[in-house]
Amino acid sequence: MAGVGPGGYAAEFVPPPECPVFEPSWEEFTDPLSFIGRIRPLAEKTGICKIRPPKDWQPPFACEVKSFRFTPRVQRLNELEAMTRVRLDFLDQLAKFWELQGSTLKIPVVERKILDLYALSKIVASKGGFEMVTKEKKWSKVGSRLGYLPGKGTGSLLKSHYERILYPYELFQSGVSLMGVQMPNLDLKEKVEPEVLSTDTQTSPEPGTRMNILPKRTRRVKTQSESGDVSRNTELKKLQIFGAGPKVVGLAMGTKDKEDEVTRRRKVTNRSDAFNMQMRQRKGTLSVNFVDLYVCMFCGRGNNEDKLLLCDGCDDSYHTFCLIPPLPDVPKGDWRCPKCVAEECSKPREAFGFEQAVREYTLQSFGEMADNFKSDYFNMPVHMVPTELVEKEFWRLVSSIEEDVIVEYGADISSKDFGSGFPVKDGRRKILPEEEEYALSGWNLNNMPVLEQSVLAHINVDISGMKVPWLYVGMCFSSFCWHIEDHWSYSINYLHWGEPKTWYGVPSHAAEQLEEVMRELAPELFESQPDLLHQLVTIMNPNVLMEHGVPVYRTNQCAGEFVVTFPRAYHSGFNQGYNFAEAVNFCTADWLPIGRQCVNHYRRLRRHCVFSHEELIFKMAADPECLDVGLAAMVCKELTLMTEEETRLRESVVQMGVLMSEEEVFELVPDDERQCSACRTTCFLSALTCSCNPERLVCLYHPTDLCPCPMQKKCLRYRYPLEDLPSLLYGVKVRAQSYDTWVSRVTEALSANFNHKKDLIELRVMLEDAEDRKYPENDLFRKLRDAVKEAETCASVAQLLLSKKQKHRQSPDSGRTRTKLTVEELKAFVQQLFSLPCVISQARQVKNLLDDVEEFHERAQEAMMDETPDSSKLQMLIDMGSSLYVELPELPRLKQELQQARWLDEVRLTLSDPQQVTLDVMKKLIDSGVGLAPHHAVEKAMAELQELLTVSERWEEKAKVCLQARPRHSVASLESIVNEAKNIPAFLPNVLSLKEALQKAREWTAKVEAIQSGSNYAYLEQLESLSAKGRPIPVRLEALPQVESQVAAARAWRERTGRTFLKKNSSHTLLQVLSPRTDIGVYGSGKNRRKKVKELIEKEKEKDLDLEPLSDLEEGLEETRDTAMVVAVFKEREQKEIEAMHSLRAANLAKMTMVDRIEEVKFCICRKTASGFMLQCELCKDWFHNSCVPLPKSSSQKKGSSWQAKEVKFLCPLCMRSRRPRLETILSLLVSLQKLPVRLPEGEALQCLTERAMSWQDRARQALATDELSSALAKLSVLSQRMVEQAAREKTEKIISAELQKAAANPDLQGHLPSFQQSAFNRVVSSVSSSPRQTMDYDDEETDSDEDIRETYGYDMKDTASVKSSSSLEPNLFCDEEIPIKSEEVVTHMWTAPSFCAEHAYSSASKSCSQGSSTPRKQPRKSPLVPRSLEPPVLELSPGAKAQLEELMMVGDLLEVSLDETQHIWRILQATHPPSEDRFLHIMEDDSMEEKPLKVKGKDSSEKKRKRKLEKVEQLFGEGKQKSKELKKMDKPRKKKLKLGADKSKELNKLAKKLAKEEERKKKKEKAAAAKVELVKESTEKKREKKVLDIPSKYDWSGAEESDDENAVCAAQNCQRPCKDKVDWVQCDGGCDEWFHQVCVGVSPEMAENEDYICINCAKKQGPVSPGPAPPPSFIMSYKLPMEDLKETS
């Protein structure tokens, strides 16, 4: 506990415990003294208590604030604390000693702390003094006691300080320094009587100041004995202690004579004067004149004049070395000899007391000062300073020697002079209506002392502080010291407003203990002032008192709260800040014995009494009718004791020899004149006087202290004769008689035994009687009231208990919460019922309930002792216990055991079926079992479950590890795990999974062994299936790595084979490509391909085409495992393929004969009718649109423009499904296949394909080895040599053409150009007619990627359009594709001999040789399917040889292998065809044909790209340069639509005419074309589905390239130039073959479709036309100009 540290400094303050706080109700608050009497048993244990009034009780502040002026007291905080004041007194004496010695006291600092000289002195004295400590070397221990750490040389330092400062003072105190010097008769330890200090002439420092060194202390010297003027109040006239409550000794209320006042005044000395005095300088030696006059008072010699000192007080001389202790040097200041020092120090000190401040304050000015001080001190607003901080700082300051804080306290201000804070009806001020309640309230401190129950009401005089309240105006740190109230009365304090007041209280039973502790800790103060604690000037830290066993309690009194102190309860405290409080004393009936004890205590201390206690008792007894009954009873008791004591004292005095007696009315004698001279007690009943001094008297307790005269001369003065005392006692007794009777009856009733107990009704009557007669609420009254209350409570509880028991039996399942009695409470209740001082009727029934409870207890104990809980038995007991409305302790236990029993039943049921015992079930059972109360059966089951769970989890974890192990565990190790876990009676999923994995592993191994033991290798699909199934099996399969390696090798071989055969993004599988075709006759691609197979076969059957459905070879290979069967199936599919191809070729060739139904015949893979430019597949003989299939590419582009003779053969994408590698590549794949221990359907298909290809190769070689075919091959070789020569000539012509172009730019050679041009043109035409055809290749643009096309054909897909469009420039073919051509480009593919035909190159060469300069005109025809008369072929073969070659060619084309023999046979067969035979169709569309989307090209193609395309077309078709020269004359690119059957000369003439005519209209059309650009763009987007149709070549449509097709001019004289989305044309059937807009000639589309049209010119030539329908036209065409041409035109 905190207190004072070793060095005298205060440690941190620890607040004591809080005192009780009471909050009375309004009913309790109506009677203050009764309420205080009720709380007294509890509150008096702590000495103080706090009472909070009801919230609505708020009395107004009634003081006149403006006129309220007061002078406060000055308080130095560190002088209040007892131990601190002792230290300060010691330092004062020490400083005074050294000042008289001519030195200034300077307190040293040790280890950065001021040395506590007082503590050092006490510690050294306790250890035997300076010599003993030095001798025994205990200075280090002294340092430890002072709180210094050892080992730093502190001991020696302390020794030097003690020897220098304290040791001389110690010698002086012991009297050694005065040995040999004659001294007057002085007692250095003479005690000083306490002195009454005058306060009206003292000056004080300003409040709130702080000093950091030694504080200044004001001292007064006593000059005369205590005397003073008193008021004329008869009771206070002779008192020396003025009033009760927190007050200070010596504050005289009267005035003094001026002479006494002046005499008592003394000069104020200040403790720091000793430090601040300016000492006059003394010379080290005396002058020569004085040497003979002064000698040393010790040695009597005058030598050593330089060491001879002269006293400044008495002028005596002393040698420095004769002094004790000797002085080392001559003092510089004033020096006094030991005799003068002893005289000065022996003067009595003035008693300590508070000074009055100089300044007078109002409440406002004092509040401003107080608030400024607190806010400045704590450096924060006053309301924000915590009370705990102020409390700790206060106790730190009062214990601090270094800091001196001065505050002011407006204490003991009489409300009689300044007015009370409560409203009072004293006539000074008018009471407002709202103040009336508070003016009459018993809690008004002006009313409380004079209440009917109060003893002080019988004192007629206003005792200031006891009957008249005192006011207290406090500030921060202002305090009131430890004290008890006068006559040990009650006190009550009310805080009107302001900051809290902190209180500390000590109960009355520890009052003497507190006094002893303070005497022990500060004996110096009590030596001079024995009644120090009655002077309110000394405080001590509560922590110090608590350390010494004194109980201390605290509280913070806030505004509007009361604090009550009880008799002889020491209390002290301080203010937290600016506040205003009011206090007064009061005495109740229970105080009378305490007051009597207080007078006896005062008698021992010789302390004055405020009033005579005996007088008060007899005054109340003189008028008993006005006494309260309770007070009368107490007065009767006190009066009886006093009568007995007074009789004893008088008898003892008479026995001592006092003979004279005389009656005297003591109440008429002033109190100061009837005080006992020995004990100062105020005498009332009797006193002893002597004739030698009639004014002097003593009480009968001190008869011998009166005077030395004999007792016979002394006279006994008495107030009442002994004979009159019984009569007074009888009057009081009569008043209290009724009360005594009531007391006896109540006592008898409360103490009666069981058989003689009263009924509850009788006790109620006694209580009502006491309340009606207002008997005092003493212990008996409270006991009766408590007994009645207890009996009533027990009766109501018993009735409630019995009634609820019945209700509970009727509704035991009610869920409402009820408060039940426990068994112990029931037993105690039954015991209480039978121990009541009265009888209640329900006691017996409650006893029966207790018997039922005990029976339940016995049965429950038996049930709980069972080895295994029985759920049915437990349930029955629970039902029984629930019916009793008692809190049975066994009931929760029974419910627990019921839960245990049900849990055990569940465990037994679960374990009976191992399949239900999963880990989760066991965990749930364990979790539910963990929450159960402990039981050996449950614990046993829990242990079994836990063990089973642990084992199961361990095996489950082991199985899980095995399942997830990498690498996998072997079968044997897993089987051992499964076998070991088989005996566990639980459901283990991982173990079962492991078991299943073992089963799968066995099955898998068996399958592998079965496959490996077979005669043939397994198929890849089988091994892949085994690998896929074996891989997830969590068992180490020995054969799995081998199987996976085989699968990987087989897959690698299949991927390599696929790269060899398959095109990129091919829709065919490798097995389909390697197997004979089963989809012959099936068209389409993608996912619908297989679906269309069956649908097309059904359609072909409906058309009576003999196409036998073919099965899938792949399915046959998968179903067949025998090698021989595979070969047989392949042969069977091969035969079906050949038959199906024969049927398909026949069906496709038959389409060409269906001229009348040509619109219904479907061609191409798109399965649409014939239209535009079409190509015929050499294998299936079907025709394909050039926009649906990729066009064949010249092989010369791949081989650097070589003119090697190779054919251009077109195979459709359906017939040519793969890359067709060479046989050498296939043989390397077969070698790799032989190394694989795996069967692949693709491998077997490849073997069969290879055997088929080699077999065909053998047949082909045999056929080519015949004489007829050998000679044909030789003839072709000769023609090939001619082609090489022709290529050389063509190169020469190119050089000549280039030179001509250069010459055209030279003006000097312009005249010679026509001849050169005509000559060059003729040579070019002849050379082109004899040039060999270039070989063509093809690919499938729907299935091949750009990269694949580049790899296979040598051109990009971006160039496909140009390649396609190249075919449209053949003059002898029908073509509706367009190629834009600029006039600046050299074009060599127009108006030449047909070169893009399916002829062998040798036939072309032969044809050029056989043809003359002019070519016979083709036969005019309306249908492109009508055969023309052809020229003779190059080779002639026999029908048998040709048929054999055609059959070999068909079979060879079916093979997906490239063989040289197919090229040889193809060349021979091409040479057998006529040179002009068409293998490409150009169909003119009518409106009934399906329109195809228009491919619009933008203008973003560069000129270089266009030129490259045209050069490729030139290389592809080998056309002459004469056409290019003519085209160079044209300004814009042109597209020509050439009609089959017109001869070249006629076409050229018409073209020349058209060019001249169009040149003239060119400029006019440019403006119109520009205006129509945007309109044509929109119409082009809307009509993308429309197809471009062919226009007869005799029209020159060069102007159309510059304008819109819709604005083209027809042959009509007044052409309207129709501007529509679709322009319909009609051709004249009269012979001129001119073309006309249907709108311009007035022909509707229906007429043009059903009738022949003859123009006006032809009609004139033919004469009048007979009426009737015109012959139907051949074709009606719809034309739309391509967007690219339009852009170029614009």
From Swiss-Prot:
SUPFAM superfamilies: ARID-like, Clavaminate synthase-like, FYVE/PHD zinc finger. The inhibitors KDOAM-25, CPI-455 and others inhibits its demethylase activity, resulting to cell growth arrest in cancer cells. InterPro entries: ARID_dom, ARID_dom_sf, JmjC_dom, JmjN, KDM5_C-hel, KDM5A_ARID, KDM5A_PHD1, KDM5A_PHD2. Residues 84-174 form the ARID domain. It catalyses: N(6),N(6),N(6)-trimethyl-L-lysyl(4)-[histone H3] + 3 2-oxoglutarate + 3 O2 = L-lysyl(4)-[histone H3] + 3 formaldehyde + 3 succinate + 3 CO2. There is a cross-link at K191, K1007 (Glycyl lysine isopeptide (Lys-Gly) (interchain with G-Cter in SUMO2)). A zinc finger (C5HC2) spans 676-728. Its main location: nucleus. Histone demethylase that specifically demethylates 'Lys-4' of histone H3, thereby playing a central role in histone code. Does not demethylate histone H3 'Lys-9', H3 'Lys-27', H3 'Lys-36', H3 'Lys-79' or H4 'Lys-20'. Demethylates trimethylated and dimethylated but not monomethylated H3 'Lys-4'. Regulates specific gene transcription through DNA-binding on 5'-CCGCCC-3' motif. May stimulate transcription mediated by nuclear receptors. Involved in transcriptional regulation of Hox proteins during cell differentiation. May participate in transcriptional repression of cytokines such as CXCL12. PANTHER family: LYSINE-SPECIFIC DEMETHYLASE, LYSINE-SPECIFIC DEMETHYLASE 5A. Belongs to the JARID1 histone demethylase family. This is Lysine-specific demethylase 5A. It comes from Homo sapiens. The gene is KDM5A.
